Amino acid sequence: MSVETQKETLGFQTEVKQLLHLMIHSLYSNKEIFLRELISNASDAVDKLRFEALSRPELLEGGAELKIRVSFDKDAKTVTLEDNGIGMSREDVITHLGTIAKSGTADFMKNLSGDQKKDSHLIGQFGVGFYSAFIVADQVEVFSRRAGSPSSEGVHWSSKGEGEFEVANVDKAERGTRIVLHLKNGEEEFADGYRLRNIIKKYSDHIALPIELPKEQAPAAEGEEAPAQEWETVNRASALWTRPRTEVKDEEYQEFYKHVAHDYENPLSWSHNKVEGKLEYTSLLYVPARAPFDLYQREAPRGLKLYVQRVFVMDQAESFLPLYMRFVKGVVDSNDLSLNVSREILQKDPIIDSMKSALTKRVLDMLEKLAKNEPEQYKGFWKNFGQVLKEGPAEDFANKEKIAGLLRFASTSDDSGEQSVSLADYLARGKEGQDKIYYLTGESYAQVRNSPHLEVFRKKGIEVLLLTDRIDEWLMSYLSDFDGKNFVDVARGDLDLGNLDSEEDKKAQEEIAKDKEGLIERLKAALGESVSEVRVSHRLTDSPAILAIGEQDMGLQMRQILEASGQKVPDSKPIFEFNPAHPLIGKLDAEQSEERFGDLSHILFDQAALAAGDSLKDPAAYVRRLNKLLVELSV
């Protein structure tokens, strides 16, 4: 071995110490995953070399086939994994093997469930896979040299997985990284060709470069020199997406997904397609079964792995799918793009626009198929990704109708509160002559379900969609119709049930409104600047009064969101509607004292605001008026 220089002992970052302790003590029942993680890292290192060598061919240092080699020594109780990828400098080694992103560690630890099988798959997702080596090894050595550096700039890293590690400079002729695991007592099973072969076939068959094991060779005869070691490839070593769909098993698609998505669960669905003609590309797209921890961080890394003619170009190429599909994982391999393509070029290339349009439709088709054929699976998808899909109509006008068909809502058809009703379901159940889709937005399911706005709909047996996600009012500002039927907010404007109201009903409403003109004027005077209008309600059957929103005004849900974020909210006043058939309104109409009439009017107004989910501008005045009324009633 070459002489070590500039040797120093450094302490692990606190988070790494915690992680090593967790790794060693929490994942011992699923030990074999260490090899999956180290092979995955080696594969990434080779991908990085391929990419950097596009602009700097000298990094390949005269060629040599790119590969990963796994070997073992039964006597020494070691397993060695070697790649000829990009390699690491001394600084890289200290950074990558001595520290990890604090957010990654915190999220990893937060996501640990106690289920060892699940937890063992989390380590790849949070970029801490290297440390899984300490599950089976009591000492790990890393020898590495970055491509393009002189052989004297090799580096040797060593640790026993406790509080510190050693790092020194060494000579290393070959670029890339060699990891030597010194197995713990009791872990000798891994120093075995058959065991290693099985693990590689199980977890890493899809890796698109050769993974080699030493061939078993007969021992040399006495006095003869031992023959040179021969190697054999044990995985398929071909990019899975380049193979015909008919030749790829479901299990292979699932393992490949776990590799590209760093997920432990199988995907819900996938779509594998080869496009030929004007554009030539292959895509393999996956819909995950669960949401990643950073789904709602819109600036979080997202996108597909991009390959050009099977050469890896970049991770997280976000230009191929719209933002509302940021949960989709997979790869796209193009024959039409340049190998030196950059993120900036991707944003301006018309080829990308065509591919993005086609891939977006592909994902929507996949979701439609899932919703139709696997409704229970789609329910799971909706719980995880529904709010993200709701961003779609605003971002993707061309596919608005398709996206709308995938949305799911709670409704008055049952009391479960589950978002399971599609717009197609709603229309299929519609009343004869119903030409509108009715909905109500609010802060919570309990609030909208008990809203006075629904009274007339319950009386007539008309279903109303109940929307309670924060994004819903914003969503509905981009959805005007579906399948030729307009959306109508039941809390907005003057309610018109169209064909669902008989001519007799309409005539009776007009006569009542005329009859109550005097009461309307008194209420306008009493409520003054608090309201934009006072009118007789056609919405109510049980409640005395209600607040409606002006046709062009901002809804309460959107107003509350903007106020909470400190943004300026445009002024608007509600419409006060009253139920002329309610006994309280009858008493109000008969009230002779204008002072008492004013107090009662304000109490009804404040109660209507509370029923709508709004907060009172002057709660003390409301309590004072209510107490005054209670005292008068008790005398």
Curated annotation (Swiss-Prot):
One of its GO terms (molecular function) is ATP-dependent protein folding chaperone. GO terms for cellular component: cytoplasm. Its main location: cytoplasm. Residues 561-635 are annotated as: C. SMART domains: HATPase_c. Signal peptide: none annotated. Residues 344-560 are annotated as: B. Pfam families: HATPase_c_3, HSP90. Keywords: ATP-binding, Chaperone, Cytoplasm, Nucleotide-binding, Stress response. It is found in: Cytoplasm. Residues 1-343 are annotated as: A. Molecular chaperone. Has ATPase activity. Belongs to the heat shock protein 90 family. Homodimer. This is Chaperone protein HtpG. The gene is htpG.
